[in-house]
Amino acid sequence: MGRITRLTLALATLAVFASPALINAQAMSSDVPFKVGTFGIDGEPTVGLVLRDALIIDVAAANTALEVDPMYPHIDAPEDMLELIGQYEYGLKYRLYEIVNNVVRNDLSGAAYVHRVDDVDILAPIQYPSKIMNAAVNFYTHACEGCSAEDLAARTQQRQEDRGVPYLFLKPTRGAVIGSGEDIVMPYGRDRIEWEVEMAIVIGRAGKYVSAPRAYDHVFGYMVGMDVSDRGGRPPGGYGSGSDWFVGKGHDSFAPQGPWIVPKEFFGDPMEQLHQTLVIDGVTVQEARAGDMIHNIPELIEYASSLITLFPGDVLQSGTSGGTGAGRVERATGSGYLQAGETIRATIEGIGTLVHTVVAEEGIPEDLTGAQLPPTASYRGPAPR
């Protein structure tokens, strides 16, 4: 029997057989909102609860300390974020509420299992999702980069009258997913790399053919995501039909996520709350709210789940707004592409901020035979400035 199955049975057994006193003692709400994440503590990936974006509670250690009191029955702490997400709605969230309430009510911020955020490494929260699904061109302003106000209004009205269905694509997970503070690496010779800030919806409950009205029942929470993109395309020759989405979206470090996850009960309706921005070296290049979305989050979930079963820990990103690098090129305000040494800050209000430095890969092994992806300039010339 797998660990997750055993934990599910333990939680279910607790609910059925626990004494009335224990049931009454169980926390049904958290005194304060919290976030969840994965952190490097003493060199080990550790599941933690985030309070006020300042304190990190080591869940396993805090759970052990809590269970010293016989009022709290034994529950296995989740070993990783995928396990936490999968068990959250099966009773685990109430133990997390108890941990938070114990820290807050007893002023345990100085306990050994509570750490300052500056003293830990912030890792990608989910290591790793089984799939990342991204919505392409899902904001009206992104669908009309470089448009005049009149053109944008006309194009928006036209699209609203015929929205069709969403366009989704997959990004790699391990290798592509990085946490806040890790470098975004521009692959060797690829000089047309751009940014996109997106809301990342974390699935909490498995489902196939999930209708839009039931979509939020399958959501665990929300984090900040980025869809870093290579706009250099593939070289000529060979099979060249259509866009090469793997080249465009599939490089290492091209899926930043985090810095942590806000469980849905602490965020509210994302279609009302969403406010996302992206800043490069102090200059705001993207800013959008949910009203700019072409297909809303429940519709994206319904569409995605009509194609493939969604599982706990899967990530669905809702797309980006205008203000990308490609849009800056069209407006002739400079290349708009990322440059080594720049610092990116991608923020969603109420969730947090991803911070990344851009670095360039300096070289490649000398024994490559020529089958590798070549530098963009070798077939498209230098990137425009």
Regions found by a protein language model. Give the residues of each.
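Bacterial N-terminal signal peptides
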Residues: T8-P20
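A conserved acidic, glycine/proline-rich C-terminal tail/linker
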Residues: N296-I308, L316-Q339
